[in-house]
UniProtKB/Swiss-Prot annotation:
InterPro entries: Cyt_b/b6_C, Cyt_b/b6_C_sf, Cyt_b/b6_N, Cytb/b6-like_sf, Cytochrome_b, Cytochrome_b_C_euk/bac, Cytochrome_b_N_euk/bac, Di-haem_cyt_TM. Signal peptide: none annotated. It comes from Lepus timidus (Mountain hare). The gene is MT-CYB. Heme b b566 binds at H97, H196. Keywords: Electron transport, Heme, Iron, Membrane, Metal-binding, Mitochondrion, Mitochondrion inner membrane, Respiratory chain, Transmembrane, Transmembrane helix, Transport, Ubiquinone. This is Cytochrome b. It holds the Pfam family Cytochrom_B_C. It is a multi-pass membrane protein. Belongs to the cytochrome b family. The lineage of its organism: Eukaryota, Metazoa, Chordata, Craniata, Vertebrata. A ubiquinone binds at H201. GO terms for cellular component: mitochondrial inner membrane; respiratory chain complex III. One of its GO terms (biological process) is mitochondrial electron transport, ubiquinol to cytochrome c. CDD domains: cytochrome_b_C (cd00290), Cytochrome_b_N (cd00284).
Length: 379
């Protein structure tokens, strides 16, 4: 008799995705981030669901409902901080996952890569709207500043912004709709994840060498199930360290002041995971130009597959590209730092140099390095 997991219509899908899936024998810990992102999404949906049971999306009560969750709900503080810091872990895993894709040339799987970019945008939108919900000072002013950027769109900009706000400023209507979208988007993300995996399983995983691994496959279970579980353990440990020892480390103290439209905080800045894009936005003195640079800083990922000039897929055997890749990582860290600094000398100049370098590495230097490496191969 054939095993039920191979015949049952539902279990068959699980079997082909998680048990009998042929996987490369040499994928490193950098391939753990996909499953870690799945874990993060599950943590966020569960903690978010329990938070939504006690949260009220009304300007008069939103802030106090969050306070109520932290003070009066059983383990409410734990759920709230798991959700807030879970978002940080989510973005750490996301950026590592994307970085891995760039380093090892995984972007050559076009469909998987493009769904991944859509997922990145969806997660960023969800995180932004979630940050508005506690209705603190940074929530309110962050929402005001970021939504206002859309007014830079010619002709329809102002109308669009007022349509999104549901009025002439960020107010009750805005908060209510942001809560609605923040609730629905993670489920859309979960559906997109399924499509992401569907396309990935059409080709199979890439591996560090970038060489096809069809001749050397191992079953996903038990090898990579146990490896993923170890990853889960490390992620949960780090998340718990953050939540139980310094839950407000990555947050903004301004968000413990209730939203006040009459009082602007001295430094409006987003959460740390958006600071690099915020720095790129601020480094251009023109509003529309800044918005375009902001969008392009993420959308540039869609161009990367077409800039692949190398004869090799992975950067494993490409020292010049490796150096450029790590300069790019350092540049992104610099941008993250600059995004959190006030707009004054020398930070303005550093931000502008780092922004130019960011686009130069991806659009010009990386393809050039690939061509040079191709030449070196012939020597």
């Amino acid at each position: 008799m054939t095993n039920i997991r191979k015949t049952h219509p539902l279990l068959k899908i699980v079997n082909h995705s998680l048990i009998d899936l042929p996987a490369p024998s040499n994928i490193s810990a950098w391939w753990n981030f996909g499953s870690l992102l799945g874990l993060c999404l599950m943590i966020q949906i569960l903690t978010g669901l329990f938070l939504a049971m006690h949260y009220t999306s009304d300007t008069a009560t939103a802030f106090s409902s969050v306070t109520h969750i932290c003070r009066d709900v059983n383990y409410g503080w734990l759920i709230r901080y798991l959700h807030a810091n879970g978002a940080s872990m989510f973005f750490i895993c996301l950026y590592m996952h994307v970085g891995r894709g760039i380093y090892y040339g995984s972007y050559t799987y076009l469909e998987t890569w493009n769904i991944g970019i859509i997922l990145l945008f969806a997660v960023m939108a969800t995180a932004f709207m979630g940050y508005v919900l506690p209705w603190g000072q940074m929530s309110f002013w962050g929402a005001t500043v970021i939504t206002n950027l859309l007014s830079a769109i010619p002709y329809i900009g102002t109308t669009l912004v007022e349509w999104i706000w549901g009025g002439f400023s960020v107010d009750k209507a805005t908060l209510t709709r942001f809560f609605a979208f923040h609730f629905i988007l993670p489920f859309i993300i979960a559906a997109l994840v399924m499509i992401h995996l569907l396309f990935l399983h059409e080709t199979g995983s890439n591996n560090p060498s970038g060489i096809p691994s069809d001749s050397d496959k191992i079953p996903f279970h038990p090898y990579y199930t146990i490896k993923d579980l170890l990853g889960f353990l490390v992620l949960i440990l780090l998340l718990m360290l953050l939540v139980l020892f310094s839950p407000d480390l990555l947050g903004d103290p301004d968000n413990y002041t209730p939203a006040n439209p009459l009082n602007t905080p001295p430094h409006i800045k987003p959460e740390w995971y958006f600071l690099f894009a915020y720095a790129i936005l601020r480094s251009i003195p023109n509003k529309l130009g800044g918005v375009l640079a902001l969008v392009m800083s993420i959308l540039i990922l869609a161009i990367i597959p077409f800039l692949h000039m190398s004869k090799q897929r992975s950067m494993m055997f490409r020292p010049i590209s490796q150096v450029l890749f790590w300069i790019l990582v350092a540049d992104l860290l610099t941008l993250t730092w600059i995004g959190g600094q006030p707009v004054e000398h020398p930070f303005i100049t550093i931000g502008q140099v780092a922004s130019i370098l960011y686009f130069s590495i991806i659009l010009i230097l990386m393809p050039l390095a690939s061509l040079i490496e191709n030449k070196i191969l012939k020597w």
